Amino acid sequence: MKRKLLATLLTAAMTASLLAGCAAPAAGTAAAAPEASSEATEEAAAPAEGEKIKIGCSIWSSTDALGSQCKQILDAAAEAVGAEVQYVDTGFVADQVTASVEQLAAAGCQGIIICNSADSEMALATQTCNDNKVYLAQFFRVVSEENSPEIYKMVKESPYFIGAVHEDEIENGKELIRILTEEQGRRNIGLIGWVQGDATWLGRWEGYKQGIEAWNEAHPDDPATLSEPQYAGTSSDGGRQAAEALMSADPDTDALIAAGGNGNPLQGTIAAVEGAGKVGEIAIVSTDFIPELGERLADGSMAAESGGHYCDPLFAFMMVYNAIKGNYTVSTDSFEEIIFPYIFVASKEDYDNYAQYFVDELPYTQEELKAMSELSIEDLAKEAAIHSLADVQKRHAK
């Protein structure tokens, strides 16, 4: 059985819409996993004395709202431990995701962290790392045993696949529905996805559906509805068009969920609601914090958002770094799994408190990052478990 190093995710603090911080089961039927190379059983050579460790990062974008924050914390971690990070932006295009792993391996990276889109991409990614003796870990993602059993078996048996850091997207989706139905009193909810089949999107969608089912079971005389998704891609214009389509199809729409897409579809959704003159009348919730979130919560153009999880790839980086150093043993019958917590905010005060410790400064100092690099895998998981506004406030009290 897969070994799970679970971080506390949606605690009582989540109910208070704060003090709680992409992914989920992957898309449908995945491509069959290629057979492992016979060379993959050989261990990678540890870096020579004084040799600088180089870790590759395959990411959808290192420049958008979430991606740039991920890059900032990864660059800080690399500086703290004397390593180097090389980035390849993929746009979540399948061919570019798999090609990025080949590119990073060819560039001499001893390890790679990857945010893939679908499980199918992990077959070639893992095979490439096996063939090149390069360590691999996922961030914002985990391969689904249920949906992709062959690929799950492949990564589990790989001597170079260390594990995955991801969020519990089903619980995230359920909590956003709870906020809309219980706290906001909304009943006609329109849903905006980003890319069909994206692993994280599917997890959140399942959470939204479970949240609606739970509400309706408890309140049969006051049911809530959730529309079929309109897809926005990852652009602001796509978000605007999707929101306009939902409002046109159901004039009684009183809430919109911009499920993700790293902030851009949310911006378009807000613009569409503003253009329709329905700010406040239609409550908007989303995942992935945007820079002006505090102002949006203050003026009523947003009701709540989950996010603050940009340190997720930091923990994948630390897993790969320690595997390269020879400090972590990679199992060939399981993989490490760290579930990372979200932070939920529902007011400008909530966001201002968050921004003080996560935007105006990083949640970890250089000294703390260096100390983190020396943790065992068990203690690294414990460190992820306590990641929250309260934890950072305690460590960086002002």
Question: Residue ranges of each PLM-predicted region?
Answer:
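Positively charged n-region of N-terminal signal peptides that target proteins for export
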Residues: 1-12
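C-terminal motif of bacterial Sec signal peptides marking the signal peptidase cleavage site
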Residues: 17-21
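A residue-level marker of the well-folded mature domains of exported/periplasmic proteins
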Residues: 22-398
